[in-house]
Amino acid sequence: MHLSSDEVVLWQSGFLKLNLTIVTTWAVMLLLAGGSWLITRRLSTGITISRWQSVLEIIVTMARRQIGEVGLQKPEKYLPFIATLFLFIATANLCTVIPGYEPPTGSLSTTAALALSVFIAVPLFGIAESGLVGYLKTYAEPTPIMLPFNIVGELTRTMALAVRLFGNMMSGDMILVILLTISPLVFPVLMNILGLLTGMVQAYIFSILATVYIAAATRTREKSTS
């Protein structure tokens, strides 16, 4: 038994390794890219639209509303990044219904990469709204004494994002393995359903936290323009 899909090495040449995490990550990305192309290739602005377009419009509308409720005044600016995070994590977790599939979100390297993308995006959005000087001033609020604490807080919350998602996904897998040894017939079905629900919740929480961090980084500019 292995704790992470990182341990499953499919190919190796010297220090180069191709593990299961990389394969499943690219598989999820290709699935999302292919699905997006199929859904958007025949978009219509008429009265009659396809079923898939209806689903897509519902998802986009809900995402924009949720981003706006967090406090961002222009949800469309942040929608591509936030929605991509949610769809990747949700799709990766929902694919656990496929036999033999192990979600890349069960790997600390994947969750760390997702958290790193948020860590990079937050100052970029903040600088775009407030300018470089305006954004850097937020680290000295409410007093310059708080500068080192704010910097440490920025780093630790990024680590928390990665560890939270990894820990929740890993604990779900471990519980499933334990219950399989107790009752191999009933518990797996119930735990798979619970696992899918947990995966969706974790995708939602990760996306919301990313939105909150971006809202905090852009709050100075939005306050000045309101």
Swiss-Prot record:
Q: Where in the cell is it found?
A: Cell inner membrane
Annotated transmembrane regions: 20-40, 78-98, 113-133, 174-194, 196-216
Q: Which UniProt keywords apply?
A: ATP synthesis, Cell inner membrane, Cell membrane, CF(0), Hydrogen ion transport, Ion transport, Membrane, Transmembrane, Transmembrane helix, Transport
Name the record gives this protein = ATP synthase subunit a 1
By sequence similarity, the record places it as follows: Belongs to the ATPase A chain family.
Q: How does it assemble?
A: F-type ATPases have 2 components, CF(1) - the catalytic core - and CF(0) - the membrane proton channel. CF(1) has five subunits: alpha(3), beta(3), gamma(1), delta(1), epsilon(1). CF(0) has four main subunits: a, b, b' and c.
Q: A GO CC term?
A: plasma membrane
Q: What is its main location?
A: membrane
Q: Classify the protein's membrane topology as the record does.
A: Multi-pass membrane protein
Q: What does this protein do?
A: Key component of the proton channel; it plays a direct role in the translocation of protons across the membrane.
Q: Which one GO biological process term can you cite for this protein? A: proton motive force-driven plasma membrane ATP synthesis
Any GO molecular function: proton-transporting ATP synthase activity, rotational mechanism
Under InterPro entries, the record lists: Alt_ATP_synth_F0_Asu (IPR017692), ATP_syn_F0_a_bact/chloroplast (IPR045082), ATP_synth_F0_asu (IPR000568), ATP_synth_F0_asu_AS (IPR023011), F0_ATP_A_sf (IPR035908)
Quick one: which gene encodes this? atpB1
